[in-house]
C-alpha cells in the first residue's frame, strides 16, 4: 500500500491529497483516463497510461495502453500496476509481430521484382537494377533481424519536476492555476523496436473530479483535468487520476 493510501486510511478518507507533494514524496500510482464529453466516469472510459511515482522524485510510465476503467474495479495499486505492465509488454510483442509481417511482405515484393528484372536480360541497365534491388533486400534483412532478435525490457523510472502557471486558452477558466508536470517516458519507435525517450508536459487544473471521489463499479477516483492536449477537440476530456477510498475529499494544489 502506498504512503498516500496509508494516510488516507488513517484519516478515514477525509484528507485531501496535496499536490505536487504527493507525487514527489510518496509512493503512489496515477493514471490517465479519457472520458470524452461526459462529466462522469463510466466503466468504458479508457485508461491510456499508468504512472508509478516512487516517492523519490521519479516516475515510471506505462504509456500506449487501452484498458477499460472498469477493468480496474476492485483492484489495488499493485494490481493496477501489474495490469499496466502486462499490457505494455504485450504491446511490445504485438508491435514486433506487425513489423515482422510488414518486412516480410516488403522482402517478398523485392524478390519478385528481382526475378522479373532478371528475366529482362543481361544488359548493363538490368545489372544496375538488380544491384539496387539486392542492396534494398540486404537492408531489409538487417532490419528484419534486428526486429527478430529484439527482447522486451521494462521501462526505466525518470526524474519528474513541476512548476505552477495559469491556463489562459480556455475563456471559461482563464487565469486558473495549473500544475505543470514535466518528465520523460519511453515509447516504441514506429518503424523499429527501439525505445525512444520522449519528454512529456502535463498541464493539470481543477476539473470535475478534484473535490469528490467518483465511483466506478465499487472503486473510487479523484483527479485533475489535463488541459491543452494536442489533437483534442472542445469537450474532449482527459483526467490525471488516482484510486482513493469512498468519501475522500479530493485534491488540493499547494504552491
Sequence positions of predicted segments:
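C-terminal motif of bacterial Sec signal peptides marking the signal peptidase cleavage site
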Residues: 7-10
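N-terminal helix-cap/turn-to-beta initiation motif at the start of protein domains
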Residues: 14-31
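Short, solvent-exposed loop/turn elements at domain surfaces
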Residues: 16, 35-44
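Contiguous, well-ordered beta-strand patches that form the walls/edges
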Residues: 40-46, 58-231
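Long, solvent-exposed N-terminal ectodomains/accessory regions
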Residues: 49-54
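Short, exposed beta-strand-loop hairpins at the edges of beta-sheets
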Residues: 229-243
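Short, low-complexity, Pro/Ser/Thr/Gly-rich segments in the mature regions of secreted, periplasmic
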Residues: 241-255
